[in-house]
């Protein structure tokens, strides 16, 4: 007898003499063997199940994705060294920040390329773009022949390279972990929030890497992504996991959550104590590197377990073949009494509509999604890009401390959705991504208004809030795209969505630079000092974020039915009759 709606637990296989034997299809830890006579003493061999890809290979691809995400934010350290660039006005600095985002306008090319080109090559192309974009700037930064438009184009090229690596990471997380795709995506993308922290720690650990701070960061931005991409390229493969042990999945994700929390805690502690000596910075970098390497233990442990299972299976088959010639074998695998509950993914009753191409642009939901993202997540990114100038205008000397703080809290913000997805799946419920985004935008709007207070404490608190919410919105948006428009055209659809980032970066960044320059001009100076420099900007940004929150609420109301289409996980008791 089998549970309703599930395939029968027992299948028949014809024996050589016309008799039947039964083999249970339920994976278990207990095996019962009996014998029955067959004609002529013929020996019967059990059919072996189809081999599926090793589960350790899936986790190896996720570890590779995590490492790629960790270094795939070289543009996030721009606020640290932007003030070091000579002969560049505040407006031009904002245009350079926009240039990195402008590369995302052509990010959809990476989605198309991923349909026809192996993923390691796609990632390598992205790393090459970054190597050329930042490497040429490093070599020619002090050259009088380097014009502003050269910097703009090179920065845009490097920004486009980020899209290529992100596309690879998203596809690996979505397709290699079909039953836990939202958890895998959120977990992997959370490490992108550590990029600024990693680059600032590397720069502080190796202060003599170049003759200026700007050149140090440009060199790291050019070289580090290429080194990591080449190192992890063999693991960047798609697999078809035909049999998935939910118990193993849950255990592995719980271990990964613990490692991730420890990594985030290390980053926050390092951000708070970033004014320590160089030796302390090196020790912190070593501890952070060790924690980033620890996830490799998960696929290693899974590989050892798989090898042990193969050895056990080979011994069992040898015992079967060594049985007497006058007997046939009936193998019935039953569920261990202590592990009777098994999680099964129930197929969707209502298939989700797949939307892509020009059809996407005709959907009102897309434009609600586009502008709500622009007025929240993109706005937060513009704020983070301007942290250097904001800190300088308020008289804060250690800009890297503020940038590291925003990076560390952005990491936890990106990690938050993975916890929500994991525990909601365990409880059999699904959380609307658009509803999550709307709930994250409200505190972000409050943080912008909080910045109107000139105190340094409010600047640090608001930076932490905006960093957390921006990271969470960015992570949630990856799953929201497939939730709203389907997973088939995800690579192209999400790159079309993130084209709002360069548009918003240009509008919000240029407007803030214009107000900054106007305030400085009114004082008869080239730079502006004091809380009033960005006061009008923060008020306008806060109001804009409120509008984005309202748009996202409307999108949530329109798309609530999508949450019901997501797979539901049920617990059932396996029985063998």
Model-derived features with residue positions:
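C-terminal transmembrane helical hairpin of 12-TM major facilitator-type secondary transporters
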Residues: 369-371, 375, 379-381, 394, ...
